[in-house]
Design a protein with these regions (language model features):
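Short S/T/G/P-rich N-terminal loop/turn motif that feeds into the first structured element of a domain
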Residues: 1-54, 59-71, 92-98
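C-terminal structural segments of small proteins and small subunits
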Residues: 66, 71-85, 89
Length: 98
């Protein structure tokens, strides 16, 4: 567990693309288990008033697990779709506290 990282990912859809953003994320998040990573939490909002459309909390076994996921050819093959539907992404490390 010493190398484990937890991330918060906030995503904003391009105009009219909130459903397409969710569909894209459904596809790419399904790849996480292949890279020793998982979704801890995923919430979807309206994106109103400048808020993100989707917020995810992800756990990866290590930085190399995250790097493997980000470089997965199944994911990178969808980069045009990602660029079309996602206007902005913020990804940063967090500590989960209950």
């Amino acid at each position: 567990m010493g190398n484990e990282i937890t991330l918060c990912c906030m995503l904003w859809a391009g105009p009219g693309n909130s459903a397409a953003l969710t569909a894209y994320e459904d596809t790419v998040l399904a790849l996480l288990p292949d890279h020793d990573a998982e979704v801890l939490s995923r919430v979807v909002g309206t994106g109103a008033d400048g808020h993100p459309h989707e917020v995810q909390i992800l756990r990866c076994a290590s930085r190399s697990a995250l790097d493997g996921y980000l470089a997965d050819p199944r994911r990178t093959a969808l980069s045009d779709e990602r660029d079309r539907v996602i206007a902005r992404t913020e990804l940063f490390e967090v500590d989960v506290r209950v």
